[in-house]
């Protein structure tokens, strides 16, 4: 099946030789399995129900999504998490103290969904809130952290997204509430990734790791938008808005703890039931830039579109193996902006093999030319330059070259 299952008793790094054979020949690859206390050594990849479906999530939707991600190749490229967002539970907690699953949406329960996903090589994420009620007004986990954490573990949950609606505004109170749930998750017999979602209002990059977090939102909710001011239509932020928020936070990203600039909006195309607000969405070029920038920033890659029905352009963006490899590079370094010009940016991300990923972004509505050479980017080697989007080598780049960018376009190169 290609799915490796099992348990390891002792910590350590284990080497496994994998062999593949078909009519074209045979190949081997060494797989390193790191076993230790730290989770999420690379940014999580997967899918979340919120951006397209909002409150309209069901068991059937989750299972169909998993099947689609197997068929279209997403699972095999690392999109492992399938995350249930708000509205899986009833408004009121049960008399026995447990959260009640909405059986009209999940008639066979959450464990059934988890088992279905695990059998196919996926992991299950779930959602709750550090208050009595979630953002949608259904049952939250405040005061019942241990009970809920045990339930999540017994169902087979692998990730908890923990929101902060209807909770105290202060940083100290937020840290206390997140620390309590983080401690409850660690007390279970299951490794559960803890996703902290308080929208960056209390600088979680400075404390989230201390309370057990593995990723933390740095901004308000993303919209299916390229750029907009926050006072429009619910305060949703555009892709460029969030890019600016996350840009100065690179020092806080590392294996086991990631800045989270929110989920991907690639391919939504204005069809969201939760974040679209009748938006027409972005162009394919803007979606391509969005994905490239999130890969450069070592961001979580959690898709929010309907993966059951994607056009070729969306699929091509999300299945770019080279961009995914940049995102999943084991060094875990978030790209830093090397050049901020009037109309364009140049971003640099060191990679584990000694090469560098270079991203050139056009921020304006007209074309831009960017000159790249050893003088414009310090320490840049141009012996071999690979165009990640086009999937080809750049000819005659040893002394530098001109990168031509269409409006909103981002091109990425690997330079050795």
Predicted regions and their residues:
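C-terminal beta-strand-rich structural cap/linker in extracellular carbohydrate-active enzymes
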Residues: 396-416
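Carbohydrate-binding surface patches
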Residues: 288, 294-297, 302-304, 340-378, ...
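C-terminal edge beta-strand
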Residues: 25-36
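An acidic-aromatic substrate-binding cleft motif
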Residues: 34-59
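Glycan-recognition surfaces
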Residues: 144-147, 193-305
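Strand-loop-strand motifs at the edges of beta-sheets in extracellular beta-sandwich domains
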Residues: 1-9
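Aromatic-lined carbohydrate-binding/catalytic grooves of carbohydrate-active enzymes
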Residues: 51, 65, 69-171
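A short beta-strand micro-motif common to beta-rich folds, especially ectodomain repeats
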Residues: 12-22
């Amino acid at each position: 099946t290609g799915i490796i299952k099992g348990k390891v008793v002792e910590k350590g790094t284990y080497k496994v030789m994998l062999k593949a054979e078909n009519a074209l020949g045979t190949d081997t690859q060494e797989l390193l399995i790191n076993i230790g206390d730290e989770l999420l050594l690379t940014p999580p990849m997967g899918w979340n129900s919120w951006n397209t479906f909002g409150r309209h999530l069901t068991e059937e939707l989750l299972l169909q999504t998993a099947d689609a991600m197997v068929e279209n190749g997403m699972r095999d490229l690392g999109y492992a998490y399938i995350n249930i967002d708000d509205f899986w539970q009833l408004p009121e907690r049960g008399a026995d103290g447990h959260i009640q699953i909405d059986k009209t949406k999940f008639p066979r329960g959450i464990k059934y969904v988890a088992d279905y996903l695990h059998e196919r090589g996926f992991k299950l994420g779930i959602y709750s809130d550090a208050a009595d009620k979630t953002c949608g007004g259904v049952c939250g986990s405040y005061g019942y952290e241990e009970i809920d954490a045990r339930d999540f573990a017994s169902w087979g949950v692998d990730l908890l997204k923990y929101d902060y609606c209807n909770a105290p505004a202060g940083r100290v109170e937020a840290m206390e509430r997140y620390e309590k749930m983080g401690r409850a998750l660690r007390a279970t017999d299951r490794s559960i990734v803890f996703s902290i979602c308080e929208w960056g209002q209390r600088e979680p990059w400075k404390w989230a790791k201390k309370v057990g977090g593995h990723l933390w939102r740095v901004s308000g909710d993303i919209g299916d938008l390229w750029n907009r001011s926050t006072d429009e239509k619910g305060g949703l932020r555009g892709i460029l808005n969030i890019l600016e928020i996350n840009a100065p936070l690179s020092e806080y990203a590392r294996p086991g703890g990631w800045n989270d600039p929110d989920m991907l909006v690639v391919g939504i195309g204005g069809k969201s039931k939760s974040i679209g607000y009748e938006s027409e969405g972005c162009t394919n070029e803007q979606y391509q830039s969005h994905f490239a920038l999130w890969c450069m920033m070592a961001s979580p890659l959690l898709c929010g579109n309907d993966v059951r029905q994607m056009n070729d352009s969306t699929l091509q963006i999300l299945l770019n193996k080279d961009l995914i490899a940049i995102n999943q590079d084991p060094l875990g370094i978030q790209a830093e902006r090397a050049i901020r010009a009037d109309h364009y940016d140049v971003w640099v991300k060191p990679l584990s093999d000694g090469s560098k990923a270079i991203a050139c972004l056009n921020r304006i509505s007209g074309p831009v030319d960017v000159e790249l050479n050893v003088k414009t980017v310090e320490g840049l080697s141009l012996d071999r330059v690979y165009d990640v989007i086009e999937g080809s080598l750049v000819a005659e780049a040893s002394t530098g070259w001109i990168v031509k960018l269409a409006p909103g376009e981002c091109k990425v190169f690997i330079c050795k």
